[in-house]
Amino acid sequence: MIEADRLIAASGRDREEVQDRAIRPLSLDEYIGQPVVREQMALFIQAARGRGESLDHTLIFGPPGLGKTTLANIIAHEMGVSVKSTSGPILERPGDLAAMLTNLEPHDVLFIDEIHRLSPVVEEVLYPAMEDFQLDIMIGEGPAARSIKLDLPPFTLVGATTRAGMLTNPLRDRFGIVQRLEFYNDKDLSTIVSRSANILGLAIEDQGAYEIARRARGTPRIANRLLRRVRDYAEVRGKGQITKAVADMALNLLDVDERGFDHSDRRLLLTMIEKFDGGPVGVDNLAAAISEERHTIEDVLEPYLIQQGYIMRTPRGRVVTRHAYLHFGLNIPGRLGEGGDFSGPGDE
């Protein structure tokens, strides 16, 4: 799949997860960006600790790479408790969840990534655990089967998802705290890059950090990945120091332009402009034209381009906006005018 091969993919990689642990912030004071989330969580945590209670169950959602796992670990650290981590697809049977719940200490954090992928049978077991701190499990099979209740210590469930809309209402309603993570601005990302470089022992100028940040698509995970690749370039061709010029040359070599677009992004936009006159074009026709799967366009390529205002979905199909023409230095068609685009957005 194209996502796994992209330098600017927001999804994580196994080796990357290990490397990122060394540069993750451990406290809210070290946490950069997301000011509203940070202030709210500091308040909730302080209140819970003051009462000697576990924090309310917390749902964190937003695009991949924005720090949901990092925030879950910070919550545990600030509460002074341990965190046990798992993910929705791993919890295949009720027994898998029961094993984790029964190993929790009072006020511990249970972190479930991709919580929207929990199976219905596991989710049913989770309801009484969240609400009453009790575990209802079946022992035996057939006529000899019986239900037993196990008391659980008070704990905090922290669920993370990129697709909050896929959560069932009963599960969503059991979270007392719901936090949405937004894309980062260039200033905050630049601070993150500088902090990561300092931890890794890299010499970096402020302008070099900003150059990396502005091409990172508003995502800390991408910013840290680009930093590691720019580090390689700087060590071989830049005397070990990351300046604006070194960062610019490195990222151009890596085919990441000033808007954070790579070859796949540009190919999609140029195909729409050159082969379909800017659209409207159906997603199946577009997929055939660039030899990609439909879901790759919808789940991997489109979201950032739509969020940045380069593509619109209309009732008639996808269209590029005037920003796409300006990005490539092309003349803007008269039908787009000064205001920009077609009559209005829609969902195809």
Curated annotation (Swiss-Prot):
InterPro entries: AAA+_ATPase, AAA_lid_4, DNA_helicase_Holl-junc_RuvB, P-loop_NTPase, RuvB-like_N, RuvB_C, WH-like_DNA-bd_sf, WH_DNA-bd_sf
Residues that coordinate or bind ATP: I23, R24, G65, K68, T69, T70, E131, D132, F133, R174, Y184, R221
Region feature Large ATPase domain (RuvB-L), mapped onto this chain: 4-184
GO cellular component term, pick one: Holliday junction resolvase complex
Catalysed conversion reaction: ATP + H2O = ADP + phosphate + H(+)
BP GO terms, sorted: DNA recombination; DNA repair
Residues given in the record as DNA binding sites: R294, R313, R318
Region annotation (Small ATPAse domain (RuvB-S)) ranges: 185-255
Protein origin, superkingdom: Bacteria
Cell location: Cytoplasm
Enzyme Commission number, as recorded: 3.6.4.-
Main location class: cytoplasm
Subunit comment: Homohexamer. Forms an RuvA(8)-RuvB(12)-Holliday junction (HJ) complex. HJ DNA is sandwiched between 2 RuvA tetramers; dsDNA enters through RuvA and exits via RuvB. An RuvB hexamer assembles on each DNA strand where it exits the tetramer. Each RuvB hexamer is contacted by two RuvA subunits (via domain III) on 2 adjacent RuvB subunits; this complex drives branch migration. In the full resolvosome a probable DNA-RuvA(4)-RuvB(12)-RuvC(2) complex forms which resolves the HJ.
Entry remark concerning the domains of this protein: Has 3 domains, the large (RuvB-L) and small ATPase (RuvB-S) domains and the C-terminal head (RuvB-H) domain. The head domain binds DNA, while the ATPase domains jointly bind ATP, ADP or are empty depending on the state of the subunit in the translocation cycle. During a single DNA translocation step the structure of each domain remains the same, but their relative positions change.
Functional summary from the UniProt entry: The RuvA-RuvB-RuvC complex processes Holliday junction (HJ) DNA during genetic recombination and DNA repair, while the RuvA-RuvB complex plays an important role in the rescue of blocked DNA replication forks via replication fork reversal (RFR). RuvA specifically binds to HJ cruciform DNA, conferring on it an open structure. The RuvB hexamer acts as an ATP-dependent pump, pulling dsDNA into and through the RuvAB complex. RuvB forms 2 homohexamers on either side of HJ DNA bound by 1 or 2 RuvA tetramers; 4 subunits per hexamer contact DNA at a time.
Family, per entry: Belongs to the RuvB family.
Protein name per the record: Holliday junction branch migration complex subunit RuvB
Source organism of the structure: Pseudomonas putida (strain ATCC 700007 / DSM 6899 / JCM 31910 / BCRC 17059 / LMG 24140 / F1)
Lineage start: Bacteria, Pseudomonadati, Pseudomonadota, Gammaproteobacteria, Pseudomonadales
Gene: ruvB
